Every structure is written in structure tokens, then in C-alpha cells.
Amino acid sequence: MSIDADFSDYEDEASGDENVLPNTTTKRKASTTSSKSRAKKASTPDLRQTSLTSMTASEQIPLVTNNGNGNSNVSTQYQRLTPREHVLRRPDTYIGSIEPTTSEMWVFDSEKNKLDYKAVTYVPGLYKIFDEIIVNAADNKVRDPNMNTLKVTLDPEANVISIYNNGKGIPIEIHDKEKIYIPELIFGNLLTSSNYDDNQKKVTGGRNGYGAKLCNIFSTEFVVETADKERMKKYKQTWYDNMSRKSEPVITSLKKPDEYTKITFKPDLAKFGMDKIDDDMVSIIKRRIYDMAGTVRETKVYLNNERISISGFKKYVEMYLASDTKPDEEPPRVIYEHVNDRWDVAFAVSDGQFKQVSFVNNISTIRGGTHVNYVANKIVDAIDEVVKKENKKAPVKAFQIKNYVQVFVNCQIENPSFDSQTKETLTTKVSAFGSQCTLSDKFLKAIKKSSVVEEVLKFATAKADQQLSKGDGGLRSRITGLTKLEDANKAGTKESHKCVLILTEGDSAKSLAVSGLSVVGRDYYGVFPLRGKLLNVREASHSQILNNKEIQAIKKIMGFTHKKTYTDVKGLRYGHLMIMTDQDHDGSHIKGLIINYLESSYPSLLQIPGFLIQFITPIIKCTRGNQVQAFYTLPEYEYWKEANNNGRGWKIKYYKGLGTSDHDDMKSYFSDLDRHMKYFHAMQEKDAELIEMAFAKKKADVRKEWLRTYRPGIYMDYTQPQIPIDDFINRELIQFSMADNIRSIPSVVDGLKPGQRKVVYYCFKRNLVHETKVSRLAGYVASETAYHHGEVSMEQTIVNLAQNFVGSNNINLLMPNGQFGTRSEGGKNASASRYLNTALSPLARVLFNSNDDQLLNYQNDEGQWIEPEYYVPILPMVLVNGAEGIGTGWSTFIPNYNPKDITANLRHMLNGEPLEIMTPWYRGFRGSITKVAPDRYKISGIINQIGENKVEITELPIRFWTQDMKEYLEAGLVGTEKIRKFIVDYESHHGEGNVHFNVTLTEAGMKEALNESLEVKFKLSRTQATSNMIAFDASGRIKKYDSVEDILTEFYEVRLRTYQRRKEHMVNELEKRFDRFSNQARFIHMIIEGELVVSKKKKKDLIVELKEKKFQPISKPKKGHLVDLEVENALAEEEQSGDVSQDEDSDAYNYLLSMPLWSLTYERYVELLKKKDEVMAELDALIKKTPKELWLHDLDAFEHAWNKVMDDIQREMLEEEQSSRDFVNRTKKKPRGKSTGTRKPRAIAGSSSSTAVKKEASSESKPSTTNRKQQTLLEFAASKEPEKSSDINIVKTEDNSHGLSVEENRISKSPGLDSSDSGKSRKRSQSVDSEDAGSKKPVKKIAASASGRGRKTNKPVATTIFSSDDEDDLLPSSLKPSTITSTKASAKNKGKKASSVKKQSPEDDDDDFIIPGSSSTPKASSTNAEPPEDSDSPIRKRPTRRAAATVKTPIYVDPSFDSMDEPSMQDDSFIVDNDEDVDDYDESD
């Protein structure tokens, strides 16, 4: 027995041969005398004194009585009892009730040899006195780990119970103060214990000094026997009659070392109202002995000298569960964990009621307590995590989850507190346990994978069904509370099965449906509008369904009954459900969601033929006279259009939605219901699987494969009498899913998503080289590109295209003029769009060459020509800027790569060389990117130790934003539940683009950080995978790319084919120009020689004569936006209406007949011959070039421009970092300590010159590049003097970063031709608009572009960027210069500033697209404005039918063309005087 547990509780008996030590009479007398003397001094008798006398039980416990007269004796009324008397008088306070009690509990069935949970009748007090002894025996294991045996002997017939344990015995010596033996002290005297020192933390069962004394008091005989190996003595003593009498202790010597404690007692059954220990009591005691076998570690437990087979807590739990399982069932799986030396925990799934079996310091806490709640709450929380994710039914609370938990706990608690002396419930606070029970992830994961989650979800489903049943409809003729319902008159009556409920897409569609009801009547048709899209009930939670107004309204209107299986529709208020939505992708989705709702909730209804109907309306109507063609899908219309001369001669009307139809249209639809009402076929078995595949989240992988089957052009055939559900899903619903993917996943060719492509298209179309507000640009883009998703979304798209901080775009196609966001918050800190301005980046047109624009496949949306299917840039932009998006069934992530690496690999491919391995690369990132697996990279920031407890962080992993790091440091500074405090302080020294934290750690924090590495501690590494690179290929099919090389190869093939097409187109255009120059020269020559007379002749006669003389008819060349599709469409509409002019021949010869009179000269003739030869030379040179050579030329141009950009970025980064370091150094000089990593050099990969970088960094006196004037596109491209090519008339410059010649705006330009570079350097224009001069911003982004390029060439030729004789073809208002100067004035005032004229009124212009002449066009060097007499080419002016100077229309001219002399080039633009006519087809224009 344990002396630590409760020495007051033990006396012993042992077996063996030993000598009886003589106890002298003297000593006995001394002992007696001493006891008597103490008794005399005491005010009341002491237990030791009373124990020496023999008394009956009635004599020991005086009773309070009243006299016969009813007058009480005050002295007998108020009494003081001894502690022993109080225990006997009030036993419930100490041992619980002494009356028989019936309750259900676990007992041991000896016949079945297993535990059994049943109702038993027992006396709690008797059970308690036995439990006190056996717990003390178990406590000895704590005091002496060598204890390995515990024996219990139970003899109900003889009414004897004995409990034996080996291990350390009770010291056999006399107590110094009490002068009696310690065994007698602790077993025969109440309130004696070894557990009163509260400063000593103990994990034993004894606590209050009662324990075994209670057993002694309620026994007729109580024997203590113990052996003390240290003193080689054995002690035995007996108490009788409820501890009222005792024998003298018998102390003998041990023959051999031994130690044990044994208690034998005979319960006073009379006190418990019993005459013997009955079977129920025996079964309880036996179960308690089994408890000890399971909870006392490494101890053999015997019952009546037979060892119990249970060993260990897990086996004990399995015994419990096996006993609780029916014979034909498998017992619940036990999930067990030995947490630590003080905690053993096991879990099993319960049957709907929380169960627990628990022990505290070997005490059976049958009612649980704080220890059980502590463990159970942890388990419930873990289960709740899974349930919340998977439960779509009724919400489940923690206590409801707990009902499915069965927990077993065996723990040791320091100085435990209980609710009473019966110790059934632990009340100790968790904080005072003295240990923690931290359940491992493995243990909790095993619980999550068990059937407990399934059981909880079943409960949630049952609860949801019960709640949903409350809203069941019925066959009611009148429904209230749904004001938007237009109810059928016969709904809910005996004719309800004939009624049709029309569900419309919105209120406007409802009004149209109601107007149609005037044709068919209101008796059998009802209408109810849906607000937006119906809820996806398959993925919705119970509360979402219960609170969804549309779902509940449909259920109420139709009269649905939850969980009912329908065989007919007679019990419904409506026998049919008809869907009326727009014939677009969203309308298809709504139909699918309604089908999904019915299949998920009432699948039997879909098996009833004719129950579900859809109402179809045309999406396009084509009319020609009395003929009408209606189309219900766009692909169907496209097929018809291709087969019918592109729809020429037909009037085409697009019906965007039901709102486009008017009331007359709707009445006509309802007049022909057989055509417009399409019944769905009864649902087949495979249909249910398809519906689940389309809408269930868990079917994502299957949905991917389904979407792979999509082929553009498929459509729903509405000529069928019935629509199969599988056809609807595979032909119509799939188009909605693909539309979602198309919005979210980029093209592999241009790397753009549709929204981004719309922005790029509009900016190219408007040549947006001057900034405009983002908010306004978003409106323009949405309007002109048929964008259907709101301007806010478009504004964000524009902002994303312009962002250039680390981790965003490697090449931003738009300029971020304003606060477009920084790496501090990953761009989320961008200003509102109304404060932001943007324009095209100079690199945009280098990457997206304008010569490709006319080769693209432009799309048409409802008759409006919009962006192409994809652009074909010279680099795969999907690799340059990466991609990320989530669609339907598919998501994508493609990292950014270095444009220089991409360019190098493209060169290798063009030259037939092997490719180099490419690693992800982010512009401005200075950390490291390391390949750790074939499809995985590790991205690391930079951290260095700069002091004993100090570190410096100068780079973060990609997309680990500065604010994220700051929040992590804050958490480490104050400490949180997940992060212990390990930081003393930190400082921030970073600017907009760089990262710089100085962090001071605690001593323990630094030690911990170094142990696990600074990189890990500060989360400075992340992984990036290339295993999900998804994009649309050139054919519009979604495709997964296994490697970067796969993307590069596919792009290479598409791009090379496009170069071949570009060359063919340019050759064709040069041939046309050659024919025009040749015919114009012959025309002038014939007039000069008198072979052709044009005066005094009618135009039609002249045309006849021109045909006779074999002059070629040449139509006006397309201009402006290369392929003006909108104009083409307008012409097509005119053709349909029969308004096209029949004088086509007149237009075809305008290039001759519109030539100005002054051009009919010999000089002009010679000039045209020369131009013809130049075009021929250019054509010959172009024909010799291969597509690969054209591509290589463009790559050269890009690399030149890219290097300039990287140089600017490099200088800015160096300056920003140096600024932060200078500030730190000025504040306090920081000594450098041990470095845990190598700092990356500050130079950025891709920089053209590291020497220049070093020089810039070291020169403190050199002015910052941020003060330099922002470079315009003209300045960017005009830094060196060009020279005409030796073999063709193409101008090239060494500084031509765009790879564009002076001829760029003319179709003859060939970017693929080489030329020698030998011109003199030419100064950029220094003139800046006074307004712009003071508002230039530091060069922090790619330099801003401008609308033209200035060049000095050998032959001056004036050229405009367009050639049209119509006023509508003048330069768009958005491109008109703000200041117009006269060429004439320039010519007369050499070197002097020309007079200026004001531009047109603001009403005629769009402010956002004004090109200020001073900033858009650089000044040219000075030469004579007047051409010499022998000049082959006089100055050519802007062509127009009307004298341009009369209306003073400002004409923008690119000053790079040859006819411009130096004085005129000093002016930014010019107008044509009214006394000159110009040739509408002069190539110099």
C-alpha cells in the first residue's frame, strides 16, 4: 500500500515464518499511561482512549431523544460528536448512500466472462469502502515503480475481502509526536494522511485523510498487515466493531527481505441493510478489479489467486467495446494513443449517446469531469473541422457531435479535487492538471477517417429532412405571401395536372411571359420570376437551402413534398414546369441548375414524361423580304451564314436576351407553342450521372475529362421533338462551362485572357500612346469590345496589365502612371481607378507587331467586330508574364520566365540547335530559385545574421508580400496561440520596391532559429510547381502542357506560320503599290505627251478610255486599323439594303483621276518612276528573306529595347536600396556578424551592362536617373541617325529598339530586312510642352511611348499616316495635336518658330486621346524648307478633296518621312494651305 497515498489507511497481515518480538509489560503500561494522561488533558474523549474500552454500537453513538412531555433537554439537543461518531451518523457525507440503489452500470459477468452493461442494485457506501482500499493499493505503484503484483481475494459467503500489493511497505516505527506506530496512526485515526502538503505535487488517489479509515469504521473486523524491508519487521494489527476496539500490534522479525501491504476486512453488512455480499455487489467489485488490470501499468492483477488476462489500457478498452457489441456485429474500432506518462486516451464511435470511461489516479470517475471534457472537446473539435467541410445539411453543434463519441481516459492529475468524498467527478481546473494531453495529428486523423463523420452527417441529414419537411407544399388552390407569382386559375384544383408553371429569368422576362398569356389564357399557365441563378443545391448547405427564397417558393408553388417519390403529377399544384431563359450561356446554366435541383431533391419527377419543359426564343433572326430565318444557337447561325454568302442580302437582328423581344414577338411565340415549347425526355440512368458530374464538386476530375471532349461549333438541335437530358448537358451546358474556362484560362499563343485581350485590342486600335484615366478607359473598352461583366472587373484587368512590381508582370503591356499597387500588399493597395492613368507601354508594339494585325481572326459579337481570337506576339507571353486562373473543372498556374532566356531558346529553335533549360524568373527578384524536383522549384528570399541576436531580411519569396512578413514579425513580437514570442524588436527600412527588415530576436528565439535555419524560421522559402500548366491551344481546345518546352514548341509553330503569312501579305501589298506607282507615272506621262486628254470630258468617258489604254482599276487601300472590320460590316449592311453605289469603276480609278493638277508635271513623273523602282527593290529584298530571318530581326529589336528597360530598372533598384542602407547607417552603424546565407548580387539578370551598373552605384555625385525626363516613344526610337539600306529602300537604325523602319506606317515596310548602320548620332528633341515639363515622373517603369518616330533620311518625302479624301477619315479626334503650325510659315521662316493655330473645340475631341504635339513629336535638325530646283520630289501636302486650309483641320504627320525639311520638322505638325490640291493616292502621303 502507498504511504504517500494515505498512510492512515493501512494495516497488514503477511505469511511466512518470523519471530515474535517480546513486548514488555513496562512498555505497554507506559503506553497505556501515556494515553490516559492525554485523555485527561483533553476536553473530549479521544479515539485511542475509547478504543481501549469495549462498547456496543448503541453505547458508542448517543442518540438525541425528547422527554415524554415534549420538552427537550437543551444539553441533549446540542451535541458534539467524535469524528468516528460523525462518520457513522452521517455516512452519506463520506461514503455515499448506505441504502440500496438501482442504476445501470458496467459490471463483470462471471458466467459469460465479460463485462456487461445492465441495471444492478447495490449499496454505494459498500462499494466505496472497497474502492478506497484498492485505490490505495494501486497508489503504491506511484511511490514504488517496482510494485508488480496486486491480489484481491473475495469470499462473499464468509463476508471477507482482502487486498494485497507488493512493493514498499509502511514504515514500522513509532511516530515521534503521536507516540504510536505509524500503521496504527494511519489506519486507526481519522484525518491522518501523508497528503496534506499542498506544495508537494502528488498523483495519488488519497487526499483528505479519510480513505481506509472509512473502511475500518464500517467493518466488524479490519486487519492491517505490512512488511518493512528496511527495518526487517512485519506488523499486524486488528480493529473490531467499527474501529471501536483494537488489538495490540504484533511485530515480528523478517527472516528474509520482503515488503508488502495487505488489508483484510469484514464489512458491517448490518450498516448497509444487507445480510451478505450479493451477486450484484460481487459483479461490481470484480469489474473494479478489472479496472485495475487495465489502468495500473506493468502490474499483474489477481482475483481469487487467478490472474486477470487484461494487460494495458488498450486491451481494457477493447474488452469494454467487445462486451458492448452484439454477437453478430463487429466491435467498434479502437483508436488508442499513449500520449505521455500521465495520459492514455482511446476513442471509439458511439451509437448516438456520449459515453465515457475514465480514471484519475486509478479512481474510477464514473461521472467524468474536467479531464473527460478536456479530451472530448479536442476530439470533437477535430471531427467538427471535417463535418463543417462535408456537411451540406442541417448545421451540427459540438454537443451533437459529442453524442457520437465514446472516449476512454486514464490519467494522473496532481492533487486532484472531486465533487465529493465519493470521487465520482473530477473538478480540478485544466490549468492545475500538472500536465497536458496533446493529441497527435496521427491520432486525430485516424478519428477523422473513422465512421464518426459519417454518423454525424447521417444525423445532420435526418435533422435537415425533418426541417425541410416543415415547408412541404400541398394541393392548395390559393397561395399567399408570394406577390410576384402570377398563379394559374386552375392550379391546386382537380385540373392542376394540366397546369404549367413558367419560371422566367428575371422580372422583365416575367412581364413578357404574362403578355404571351393573353394568347393562351391564364387558367392553365402561371408565371414566377427567378432572381438571378438558382442555388446549386448539390453543393449547398442545409441552411442555404432552407433560407433560399427561390427554392422554397418553387417548392410551395409546385406543391412538392420532401423525399416523396412521385409516379404521377396529380398531387402537385402544377403538372408541368417550364423554364424560360435567355438563349445564352447564362440561360443554359440556369436550365442546368433547375434540372440539378429536381434530380437532387425530386428525381422521380424527371422520370415522368412531359413534366419538364423549356421555352426557346430566337437568338438571331434573319429577314429578307417575307423570308424569316430564326436561329436558337450562335453556332447554328454561323453554319448557316457560311453556307449563304456570309448572310449578304439578309437583315440580321441579334436578340441579346428575352428583353430584346417585344410583346408582339412574345405573342407570336405563344401562338406557335409547338415550335417554342420543347419537352425534356424522361431522365435515363446515365442522365443522373451526367447531372452529378456537371454540378458535384467531388466530380472535378471527371468534369475535366468531359470538358476535354468539347469542340467549338457544337450546338443543341432544337428541331428535335424532345430534348434528351444528356444532349442538353453535352451540347449546351458544356458551352457555359467552357465559357467560364475561356474567361479564366489564357491562350498559349498570346498569354492573354479574353478580358485582357479586349483591353489590348482597344489600346492598339486607338494607338493609346498618351495616358488616359483607367476608369474612362474601362468604359471605352467595355463599350467597343462587347464586354459583358461590368466595368469594375474591367478596371481591375487594366490595373493588372499595368502592374510591374516584383512578382507581377515581367513585361507590363500598359504603363502604371499612378499608384497601381506595390509588392507591399501584392497590388491590393492600388488607388481607385479614377485616380489612375495608363497608356501603352513602349514594349507593347515591339512584342505585338502591327504588321500582324491584318492577319488575325477577328471575332464578331452581335454584329460588332471585336478583338481577335488571339494575337501572335514575337514571344510566348504566357511564359513571360505567367498565368493563373480557376475555371470550371480546370485551373492553371504557369510561372514567369526570363524574356532573354525565352529569346535565346527561340533563336536556338530557329537555328536548329538544342534548347537550354529555363528556370522561373521574376523581374527585380534577388533571391534564389532552385529546382528541387522535375516539376517543382524552391523560391527563397535572403536573410543574413548581422549580430549576435540580429538578422537582416532583404528579399522575400515570390508572392510573400512585405505586409505578410510584417504581420508574421508582429506575431513573433507579441506572441500568439500558434507562434510563441521570439522577437524583441524589428525595424523596417524598405521603400516601394525593395525589402529591408532588421529583426532583433530573443536569445532563445535566435537559438531556435539557428537550429531550424533562419530561412525556415522566417518562412523565407516557398515551392512553386509546374505540374498544372493549362492553356487553350491555337485551335481553342483546352490542353495541359507537361513542360515549358512543350509551350515553347507549340508557340514556335504558330508564330513561324504567321511570319510566312505576314511575308505573303506584305509581298502582295508591295505589288499593289508597284502597280499604282507604275500606272500613275504612265498616266502623267500620257498627259504630258498629249496622248491622253482629261479636260472637257465626262468622268464615265474618261473611265472607258482608261480601260482601253489598259490602266488597272485599283480600289482604295485599307488604312487606319489595317482591317477595319466595322467599316466592312457597315458596307455589308448597305449591300443588304441595296444602297451600294453602282459606280464601282469610278472609285477604282480615283487613284488616277483624283491626282492634283500640280502633280501632272515632269518632276512628279520622274519621282513616281523612282518610287516604283524603290518598291521593286524593296519587294525583291523581301522575297529573298525567309520567315525565320524576319523573326530574328524582330528578336534583335526586342532585345535592344528590353536591355534599355532593364538598365533603368537596375539603376532604380540600386538607388532605392542604397537610400535605405544610407538611412540605416546614418542612424546607427550595424556590425556584421555571421552570415547564414550568401547575399545575391544586386545586378539583375537580363541587364545589358554590369559595368554601367557598378559605375552608377559607385558614383554618388552623378544625378539620379529618376530626375531624367521620361522618354517618349519617338525619343526612344530616334537616338541614332538611320541610314538607307544598300540593297533596298528600308531605313534601319542601330537604336531602333522596336525593329521598325521609317516606313512603318506604310504597308511597304519590311521589318525583317537588314541594313548597315553608319549614320551620325542625332540629338533627341529637347523641347517639352511647358505643362509636361514640370510634371515628368522619375523613370520607375518602362518608358512611356509616343505616336511616331523621328528619323533623318537621305530623301525627304512627306507622308501622312492615312490617305483618304473623306473628312471622316481624318485623324481621329483622339489623336489630334493640341497645337497646329503651318508648313508654309516654317518654310518662310527658317529656324524660326512657326505660327500656331488652336485645335478644334473640346466638343469635337476626346480629352483622353489628345496627342500634344510638343511631347509626341521630336524636333528635327534644321535644313532648307524649300527643295532645290533639281529635287526629284517636291514637298507633298496632306491629300483631301476639299482644301484642307479652308476648314483648318489639323492633320497629324509623322516627321520621320523623307520630304520633311529641317525647319518644318522643328514644328510638331502642319496644316495644308487652301491653295494646293493633293493627290489622294500619292504614296508620299
Swiss-Prot record:
Segments of skewed composition (Basic and acidic residues): 1216-1225, 1278-1307
InterPro entries assigned: DNA_Topoisomerase_II, HATPase_C_sf, Ribosomal_Su5_D2-typ_SF, Ribsml_uS5_D2-typ_fold_subgr, Topo_IIA, Topo_IIA-like_dom_sf, Topo_IIA_A/C_ab, Topo_IIA_A_a_sf
Enzyme class: isomerase
Site (Important for DNA bending): 886
CDD domains xrefs: HATPase_TopII-like, TOP4c, TopoIIA_Trans_ScTopoIIA, TOPRIM_TopoIIA
Ranges where the Toprim domain occurs: 499-613
A molecular function GO annotation: metal ion binding
Localization terms from the record: Nucleus
Binding site for Mg(2+) 1: 505, 582
Quaternary structure and partners: Homodimer.
Active site: 835 (o-(5'-phospho-dna)-tyrosine intermediate)
Residues annotated as site: Transition state stabilizer: 834
Annotated GO CC locations: chromatin; chromosome, centromeric core domain; euchromatin; nuclear chromosome; nucleus
Listed PROSITE patterns: TOPO_IIA (PS52040), TOPOISOMERASE_II (PS00177), TOPRIM (PS50880)
Underlying gene: top2
Polar residues bias spans: 46-59, 1260-1273, 1413-1425
Substrates-to-products reaction catalysed: ATP-dependent breakage, passage and rejoining of double-stranded DNA
Site positions per UniProt: Interaction with DNA: 533, 536, 703-704, 753, 787, 793, 961
The keyword rRNA processing is assigned to this record: no
Name of the protein in its database record: DNA topoisomerase 2
Presence of keyword NAD: no
